[in-house]
């Protein structure tokens, strides 16, 4: 990889998994449904993409706390990049 590893990782994963913003929005919908079903509550809004991304940063941090693997840090930085952009858009 010749450029920024985070941007290259995002581009590479986008080719495999598709549009990350759409994916993160869909994950938010799925997680909202799971939370509502499990707790028997109704949320006013689905989890926004930026919150999904921040939760994924926490997931990667927990993995990194267990054992070093560079991928955890690269992915966490990518999720933070998405979260910053999406939260700015959300206002």
Segment roles from a protein language model:
Residues 1-91:
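Intrinsically disordered, low-complexity regulatory regions
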């Amino acid at each position: 990889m010749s450029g920024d590893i985070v941007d290259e990782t995002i581009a590479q994963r986008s080719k495999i998994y598709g549009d990350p913003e759409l994916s993160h929005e869909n994950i938010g919908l799925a997680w909202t449904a799971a939370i509502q079903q499990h707790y028997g509550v109704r949320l006013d809004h689905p989890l926004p993409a930026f919150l999904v991304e921040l939760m994924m940063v926490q997931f990667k941090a927990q993995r990194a706390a267990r054992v070093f693997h560079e991928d955890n840090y690269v992915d966490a930085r990518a999720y933070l990049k998405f979260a910053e952009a999406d939260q700015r858009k959300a206002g």
